Each structure stands twice: as structure tokens, then as C-alpha cells.
Regions:
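Short linear capping/connector segments at secondary-structure termini
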Residues: 109-115
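N-terminal intrinsically disordered/low-complexity leader segments
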Residues: 1-12, 168, 192-194
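Hydrophobic/aromatic-rich alpha-helical bundle segments in the mid-to-C-terminal region
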Residues: 106-107, 118-130, 136-194
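Hydrophobic alpha-helical connector segments
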Residues: 62, 73-105
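Helix-turn-helix
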Residues: 16, 20, 24-58, 62
Length: 194
């Protein structure tokens, strides 16, 4: 049975607001974008926008929660798994896919780090990254420092692939796969040394 009526329209409007807001934030920056501009781009009244979101921060928080749900699920899954090389490879694979699914949000976050520090989601971003780093570490407190750096570097290789290699020629999926391959090599080397 398909959804129709007010419930579906509300869902579509909420999604449209998120999409347009993220587009404007990317074009103009978070600080320089107003709710009025978002409403104008959507061709809705400010009252219609306020029905869904009272502030720009509310929009960003909703985007963040929607797009990072797969990462929260990944962390919960990984916490229940043994700290094997296969688990760590799967963490990297799933994280890479989650980042690809929320690419526009992650680019926004990268480009607006100063603004995000002021928002309530800034701390949650750090907490997720630290949780992932801990899950990727070798599992031994006495692991050589170089191997611990490899584990952290594996995670940030995926970020670099998305954020800094987006302007190179080629298919974005090929770039993501190449970054995942390098990240997997790093975690494998760290695990084999441990």
C-alpha cells in the first residue's frame, strides 16, 4: 500500500527542505544562508518551513541524524564483533559505503568545521570518530605506535578519498574503492605486525 495524503507530503517537504538547505549551505556557507533564503528557494512561506524546522541548526541536526544512522548501526555492530582482521576490514567497507551515501553532508561538514564546532552535532561527530578509531586499533595496548597510526590513518584515508580526491578526474566510485583498498592495506599491515 503506498503512502499518500498529508503524511507523505510532509515527508517529502521535510526531505526537500533538507536537500535545498544543504545545497544552499554548500553554495553560500552555513553562516551566510538564512531560513528566508531556504523558503524562497523552495517557493514556500517561512511559516511552512517553520512547521518542519525552527532553525538552521534543526535542519543540520536532522540531516546529520538521518545520514549518520548507518554509522551508528556500524558502531553498534562492531562493538559486538571479535577484534579480528576480517571485522576491521568490514568496518572500513561499511564506513566507506556510509560516507558515500551521505557524501554531500560529509563535504558540508568538512567545509564548515568552524560552524559545526559551535553546533551541538560537533561533539557527536568527534565521538563517532573516536569510537571508530578504537574499534580499528589492534586491540593490544602495547601495539607499536606505528601500527596504531596505521589504524587511525586507515580511517582518515577514507575521509581523504571523499574530501580531497573529489576533484580528480574519474569515477567517484573508483576513487572510493581505491581509498578503501589503501585503508584496507593499512589495517592489514597493522594487524599483521601486532
Amino acid at each position: 500500500m503506498s503512502r499518500s495524503g498529508p503524511q507523505q507530503r510532509r515527508g517529502n517537504t521535510r526531505q526537500r527542505i533538507q536537500d535545498v538547505a544543504l545545497e544552499l549551505f554548500a553554495e553560500q556557507g552555513y553562516e551566510k544562508t538564512s531560513l528566508r533564503e531556504i523558503a524562497e528557494r523552495l517557493e514556500v512561506t517561512k511559516a511552512a518551513l517553520y512547521y518542519h524546522f525552527k532553525t538552521k541548526e534543526d535542519i543540520i541536526i536532522s540531516l546529520f541524524e538521518d545520514q549518520t544512522r548507518p554509522i551508528d548501526e556500524l558502531i553498534a555492530w562492531a562493538e559486538e564483533q571479535p577484534r579480528t582482521l576480517d571485522t576491521k576490514r568490514e568496518i572500513l567497507r561499511r564506513y566507506s559505503e556510509a560516507m558515500a551515501g551521505g557524501a554531500s553532508l560529509y563535504r558540508f561538514m568538512q567545509e564548515n568545521q568552524a560552524s559545526l564546532r559551535e553546533l551541538s552535532i560537533g561533539e557527536r561527530v568527534k565521538q563517532r570518530l573516536f569510537a571508530l578509531v578504537e574499534l580499528l586499533r589492534t586491540g593490544r595496548e602495547d601495539a607499536p605506535l606505528a601500527d596504531q597510526v596505521r589504524c587511525v590513518s586507515a580511517l582518515f584515508t577514507l575521509h581523504a578519498g571523499m574530501m580531497f580526491l573529489q576533484h580528480i578526474e574519474g569515477d567517484p566510485e573508483e576513487t572510493r574503492q581505491a581509498a578503501l583498498e589503501v585503508a584496507t592495506d593499512l589495517i592489514t599491515q597493522a594487524h599483521e605486525q601486532a
